[in-house]
Amino acid sequence: MKPTTISQLRRLKETGKKFATITAYDFSFAKLFEEEGIGVMLVGDSLGMTVQGHDSTLPVTVDDIAYHTRAVRRGAPHCLLLADLPFMAYATPEQAFENSAAVMRAGANMVKIEGGQWLADTVRMLTERAVPVCGHLGLTPQSVNIFGGYKVQGRDEAAAQTLLNDALALEAAGAQLLVLECVPVALAQRITNALSIPVIGIGAGNVTDGQILVMHDAFGITGGHIPKFAKNFLAEAGDMRAAVRQYIAEVESGAYPGEEHSFH
């Protein structure tokens, strides 16, 4: 198996072919995901909730991310591996560079950071120093205390325009990918069409170039509130490997996410 690259994802965008990605936190699931055809994985700070049992992502540290990144890389040596920089790990460009180095030494190919055009200088600095960056806009969980909860973003025109401007600014600064979370389908379409870099959606309809799900949502083992955009593929498929294959197939065909998983 050849490694998945950002160039391959760009070609998929150019040819209109969708791709599936998923969060991974350990060796065994990462190995399963790669064996069943997932080429892009994220060691997300969502591990604070799904693995550590916190009520938000805020307690997660760089050391936590690095630990899980090493485990995932051992299980999936060929995947394009993204790693979140957690809360307050990129408050300054210098801090972002130091912490990016830590997670890349652990095996990440790219770091993901949450925020808009105010991060352009950080993205530019990291890119110039050979650290590929994935942006993250819309509902950014590290900002949950600012948003007042987990809410759909960009529903009015002013907010939508701000998100579009943020996306363009991140791309201009050198971002290689963009995650777009919990935004109306029409806005996701505008942003996906406006950018030359691949856009990965979660709660953004089936109009983005790729999709990502938290693995616990895909297997129906999330405790507490289940997001509208989540689908339990395990319930339909019957076993984990078949569930992963079904997830990939439905993303590639555009069947998932459906209208019932989308916001307007």
Curated annotation (Swiss-Prot):
The active site is at 181 (proton acceptor). This is 3-methyl-2-oxobutanoate hydroxymethyltransferase. Pfam families: Pantoate_transf. Keywords: Cytoplasm, Magnesium, Metal-binding, Pantothenate biosynthesis, Transferase. CDD domains: KPHMT-like (cd06557). Its cofactor is Mg(2+). The keyword Metal-binding applies. Catalyzes the reversible reaction in which hydroxymethyl group from 5,10-methylenetetrahydrofolate is transferred onto alpha-ketoisovalerate to form ketopantoate. Mg(2+) binds at residues 45, 84, 114.
